[in-house]
Amino acid sequence: MSAQPVDIQIFGRSLRVNCPPDQRDALNQAADDLNQRLQDLKVRTRVTNTEQLVFIAALNISYELTQEKAKTRDYAASMEQRIRMLQQTIEQALLDQGRITEKTGQNFE
């Protein structure tokens, strides 16, 4: 699918961007989110300069993305550790099962 031009409104300004048709809803949702962030910033900071608000919003979004990446890395490391521990537990259980089988002469097939 090729990208098609889409008109969106951000902070009272029209912007035409190219977007694949299957991502149009996500683009509109992102534009709505950015609009809301800019409105909230304008109220909270009392900054009226649009360019300044956009830079502050961009910095906030970048910070949030950095935090989410760190969370994802931490979660992945935690899962890797849990998987290693589970593998060790399974390997030990299989070794123990093999020892029990050798002593009793039973096979559990």
UniProtKB/Swiss-Prot annotation:
What InterPro entries has UniProt attached to this entry? Answer: Cell_div_ZapA-like, Cell_div_ZapA-like_sf, Cell_div_ZapA_eubact, Cell_div_ZapA_N
Q: According to its UniProt record, where is this protein located?
A: Cytoplasm
The question of whether Transferase is a record keyword is answered with no
Q: According to its UniProt record, where is this protein mainly located?
A: cytoplasm
**SUPFAM superfamilies referenced in this protein's UniProt entry, alphabetically:** Cell division protein ZapA-like
Task: Give the quaternary structure.
Answer: Homodimer. Interacts with FtsZ.
Its biological purpose: Activator of cell division through the inhibition of FtsZ GTPase activity, therefore promoting FtsZ assembly into bundles of protofilaments necessary for the formation of the division Z ring. It is recruited early at mid-cell but it is not essential for cell division.
Q: What is the protein name for this chain? A: Cell division protein ZapA
Q: Which organism is it from?
A: Salmonella typhimurium (strain LT2 / SGSC1412 / ATCC 700720)
